[in-house]
Amino acid sequence: MTTQDELKRIAAEKAVEFVPENEYIGIGTGSTINFFIEALGKSGKKIKGAVSTSKKSSELLAQYDIPVVSLNEVSGLAVYIDGADEVNHALQMIKGGGGAHLNEKIVASASEKFVCIADESKYVSRLGKFPLPVEVVESARSLVSRKLLAMGGQPELRIGYTTFYGNQIVDVHGLNIDQPLTMEDEINKITGVLENGIFARDAADVLILGTEEGAKVIYPCQG
C-alpha cells in the first residue's frame, strides 16, 4: 500500500509540469510543497524566481538554488503551487494548518493560475472536518471567539503560536461549511479577524491528486 508521503510526492512531481520556464511563480507552505520544491529543484527547469509564503519554503528553495524574491519586486506570478488541508469538488479549500494562510491568499491572488497539490485523503465532498484556522488580533481574540461560537463553531486558541505578522490563530472545530464563499466572507467581516483559512474566493484552478493509481488532474466540479 502506498504511504501518504508517497502520494504527496506523486502529486508534487506531476505539478512540475504546470510550471512554465522563465517566469516568476508562487510557492506555498507545507509537507506536500516540500516535495514539490525538491522535484522542481531536481527537474532542471529554469524559472526567474519564486515568491515564498514561509521561511521554511524559502530555506528549501535556497537549497536548490531557486531565487527567492519578494512579491513587491514582481508585477505578477504565472502560477501558484500550494497544498490544502481539505479541498472539495469545486476546488474550494481549507488551508492554514501551518498558520500561513494570510500570506498564501496574498500570493494566490497575485497569480494567474492556482494549482493545488494533495494526497487523495484531502479530497472531500464537504469542507469542515479539518479545523478552520482564523488569524486574529490578540486584543480581539475573545470577541472573535464569541462570534465564532455563535456561528456554530468551537473555537480553540492555538497555544504557543504566533503568525508571521505577530497575530494569533484560533482553530474553529465543528463548523458546517455548506456555503464556503458565504462563510469566508462572514468570518472576515468580524472586527479583529485578519483572515481565515477558507479559500473560496481564491479557489484552485487545477487540483493534482496523488492516488494509488498515480497522479490525477482534476478541474472544478469534476468528481
From Swiss-Prot:
From which residue to which does the signal peptide run? none
Q: Which InterPro entries match?
A: NagB/RpiA_transferase-like (IPR037171), Ribose5P_isomerase_typA_subgr (IPR020672), Ribose5P_isomerase_type_A (IPR004788)
Q: Name one GO cellular component term.
A: cytosol
Q: Which GO terms describe its biological process?
A: D-ribose metabolic process; pentose-phosphate shunt, non-oxidative branch
Checking PANTHER family in the record gives:
RIBOSE-5-PHOSPHATE ISOMERASE (PTHR11934:SF0)
What the entry lists under NCBIfam families is as follows: PRK00702.1, rpiA
Q: What is this protein called?
A: Ribose-5-phosphate isomerase A
Give the encoding gene's name. Answer: rpiA
